[in-house]
């Protein structure tokens, strides 16, 4: 299984995704608000907002919530002002970790993030210490029920960089600038993605087992539980056998 999707698969198996639905809504609302503030309230002219709205639809978020977040972003409603930043560090076993946050209190957030790193046998690093180990990409995930050859052909024709056949799904990778063009073209050709996002994909993976694997999952869980954290990316790989031991 490709590493960049390892964490979402693990969460699904643990049944953690549904339990954190409320937090997912909160994070998407923040993203919509900031995207609208920076690029305007029209998704057609604001790719970042369009991606956030698509994510909201994928989570079945009520339309009212989406519209309220856009209004707040463009100044139609009073609300908290968020600052975006990315923290970098090392997880168990020398893994590389990127933590994207949106916060109204940077001091609180940096303290929380540093504490999570420390408690999970990792440490927070300087800006730039691990970001070079990741590439920003558009990622579309498709079910195995569709025809791979047809998906491959349509994806490359639409401008995708690569299409891979993974253990449990097909993955289409794009340049971030071509993400919406590829997604729209594939939808037009009848291919419905299970998920579609701009993400950070690790160039190399670090295999973890035993205590390191346990601490890594704990770190990912705690980071995602933090209200200020929007996304966490890490280059760990844990085998199916190792996962079974921990569950």
UniProtKB/Swiss-Prot annotation:
Q: What is a single Pfam family found in this protein's UniProt entry? A: TACO1_YebC_N
Q: Does Zinc appear among the keywords?
A: no
The main location is: cytoplasm
Name a single GO cellular component: cytosol
| SUPFAM superfamilies per UniProt | YebC-like
GO MF annotation terms: DNA binding
Cellular localisation: Cytoplasm
Q: Which NCBIfam families match?
A: PRK00110.1, PRK12378.1, YebC/PmpR family DNA-binding transcriptional regulator
Q: What is this protein called?
A: Probable transcriptional regulatory protein Gbem_3313
Q: Please tell me the species this chain comes from.
A: Citrifermentans bemidjiense (strain ATCC BAA-1014 / DSM 16622 / JCM 12645 / Bem)
